[in-house]
């Protein structure tokens, strides 16, 4: 019997609003994924302050330890743990914010994470500019992703990713 999946990336994005999953629930999810041939867990809960509203700040030690544990546990279970950052709410598109974003990715890399995403969904204003998003992502690729031989290709979520949820007035 030959048994393999047809879909390369199989898993979930924890990218919703509301009460985030507990650490224990995340570990159970990863365990479930490993047992059922799911290979991807993208961590991006909108209510994780250090993922979104406090994206410029490092994780406090206790929360950093949980991220590290998730990355290690996922690897042990054959699951790619991808940590996402969501800077679009208040990014200023200057060198300081660009450098801060790369420094944040480096800090999460030091926790053992080897897969990263940048989310630009659910925002308005300057953060929605696709040219600026592309320039930032290209910079992250050049100075962070390509620097580390053990990091997977960068993922992203654009501002508008589903036309059925947008209006004809969207200028994106």
Segments and roles (model prediction):
Residues 1-104, 110-114:
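Feature activates predominantly on carbohydrate-active enzymes
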Residues 16, 123-172:
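Catalytic-core regions of glycoside hydrolase
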Residues 43-44, 84, 119-121, 157:
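Generic beta-strand/beta-sheet core signal
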Residues 74, 100-117, 121-128, 132, ...:
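Hydrophobic or amphipathic alpha-helical targeting/insertion segments
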């Amino acid at each position: 019997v030959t048994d393999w999946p047809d879909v390369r990336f199989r898993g979930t994005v924890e990218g919703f609003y509301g009460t985030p999953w507990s650490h224990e629930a995340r570990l159970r999810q990863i365990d479930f994924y490993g047992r059922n041939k799911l290979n991807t867990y993208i961590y991006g809960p909108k209510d994780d302050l250090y993922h979104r509203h406090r994206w410029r700040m490092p994780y406090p030690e206790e929360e950093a330890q949980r991220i590290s544990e998730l990355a290690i546990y996922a690897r042990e279970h054959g699951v790619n743990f991808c940590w996402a950052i969501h800077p679009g709410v208040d990014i200023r598109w200057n060198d300081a914010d660009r450098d801060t974003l790369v420094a944040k990715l480096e800090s999460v890399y030091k926790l053992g994470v080897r897969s990263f995403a940048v989310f630009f969904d659910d925002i308005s204003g300057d953060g929605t500019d696709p040219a600026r998003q592309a320039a930032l992502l290209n910079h992250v690729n050049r100075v962070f992703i390509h620097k580390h031989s053990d990091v997977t290709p960068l993922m992203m979520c654009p501002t508008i990713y589903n036309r059925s949820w947008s209006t004809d007035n969207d200028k994106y």
